[in-house]
């Protein structure tokens, strides 16, 4: 009976919107089932703003009717796993996933499902291809470029076949093409670091003259993609690359030092100069600064990076986060007392972390979202 009511509600939502145009309807439905749920809810987001918490029923199903939809990229999070979907007016989407194999098991049905199934299949294909591309990065530049361009062309041709077979919106076309192009452009930005290494990257000789031609089409202020991970996965190594020339000019170093304060402050300067969209710029500044503070052992360098960040960021929440991180890291220097942090032990008792230890102790941490965090952090730092 619950299944019947759920699908009946989806149908009513869909039919209720049929008489309106896509631009004026502004409604959508999303529901589905989570197999082996980690907890009893998922959170639905519009950009980075939470829309609502959707609770699972006794059969691990959920349903949600969006009365006023802002068409675009949305996302949901369950148990630390994160996925992006496209929601547009009149969409009535059901999803099913198994947390034991999150992305690989995710499938959509209903109106609006084809575009989202295409995107999850593309994501899984590109993700599996990463290992191949890493090996291809050992090839000399011309051969590497030939392979990468061939893979990119293959994906674009597949997208074109999809668009011929199914009606698609301008939003889907933009997001799908961006997923392809930015993914392969990311590999090109990472290539010099992988192929030349820190000892030879200063010269970077042998790159074909057309190697960076795609840079002419970069939109540093794409509001539609401002919360889309392939876009950021590209921008981080892109600015890493752009900062190299200034770094070598100013330091005269012969060997690349990724933790150099000169190099990292150059990155902040470039982000501040080239990106005008505040949301995008603030995110780039935040994560670049976070990574530097987390891996640098010099108080003077951390002070300089922190001051540079504060002079550029316009996001108060980000600024508060970076300030907290900065102060915490300074307290973690050898000889200082452990920061005042409350933790929960295995008995579900809350205690101060400093009160737990009375002898030399090794402390380690992990995250439910370690897969995605590790991947993003690695790309940011390469």
Where do the language-model regions lie?
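A non-transmembrane, solvent-exposed segment enriched in polar/low-complexity residues
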Residues: 18-172, 190, 195, 199
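N-terminal, charged low-complexity regulatory/assembly segments
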Residues: 138-262
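N-terminal "domain-start" segment that seeds a small globular fold
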Residues: 318-354
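Positively charged, low-complexity/disordered segments
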Residues: 380-382
């Amino acid at each position: 009976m619950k299944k019947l009511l759920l699908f009946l509600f989806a149908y009513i939502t869909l039919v209720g919107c049929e008489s309106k145009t896509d631009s004026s309807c502004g409604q959508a439905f999303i529901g589905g089932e989570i197999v082996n749920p980690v907890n009893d809810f998922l959170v639905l987001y519009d950009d980075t703003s939470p829309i609502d918490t959707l609770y699972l029923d006794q059969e691990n199903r959920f349903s949600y009717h969006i009365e006023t939809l802002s068409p675009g990229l949305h996302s949901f999070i369950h148990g630390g796993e994160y996925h992006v979907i496209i929601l547009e007016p009149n969409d009535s989407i059901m999803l099913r996933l198994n947390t034991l194999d999150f992305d690989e098991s995710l499938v959509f049905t209903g109106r609006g499902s084809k575009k989202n199934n295409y995107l999850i299949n593309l994501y899984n294909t590109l993700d599996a291809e990463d290992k191949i591309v890493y090996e291809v990065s050992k090839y000399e530049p011309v051969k590497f470029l030939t392979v990468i361009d061939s893979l990119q062309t293959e994906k674009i041709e597949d997208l074109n076949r999809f668009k011929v077979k199914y009606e698609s919106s301008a939003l889907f076309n933009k997001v799908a093409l961006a997923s392809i192009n930015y993914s392969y452009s990311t590999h090109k930005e990472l290539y010099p670091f992988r192929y030349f290494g820190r000892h030879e990257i200063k010269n970077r000789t042998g790159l074909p003259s057309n190697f960076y031609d795609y840079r002419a089409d970069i939109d540093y202020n794409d509001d539609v993609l401002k919360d889309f991970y392939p876009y950021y996965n590209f921008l981080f190594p892109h600015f890493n690359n752009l900062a190299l020339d200034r770094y070598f000019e100013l330091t005269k170093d012969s060997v690349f030092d990724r933790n150099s304060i000169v190099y990292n402050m150059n990155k902040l300067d470039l982000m501040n100069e080239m990106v005008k969209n505040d949301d995008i710029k603030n995110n780039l500044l935040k994560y670049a600064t976070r990574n530097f503070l987390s891996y640098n052992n010099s108080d003077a360098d951390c002070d300089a990076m922190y001051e540079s960040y504060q002079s550029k960021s316009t996001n108060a929440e980000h600024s508060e986060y970076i300030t907290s991180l900065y102060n915490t890291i300074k307290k973690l220097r050898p000889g200082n007392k452990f920061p005042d942090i409350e933790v929960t032990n295995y008995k579900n008792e809350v205690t101060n972390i400093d009160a737990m230890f009375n002898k030399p102790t090794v402390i380690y941490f992990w995250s439910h979202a370690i897969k995605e965090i590790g991947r993003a952090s690695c790309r940011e730092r390469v």
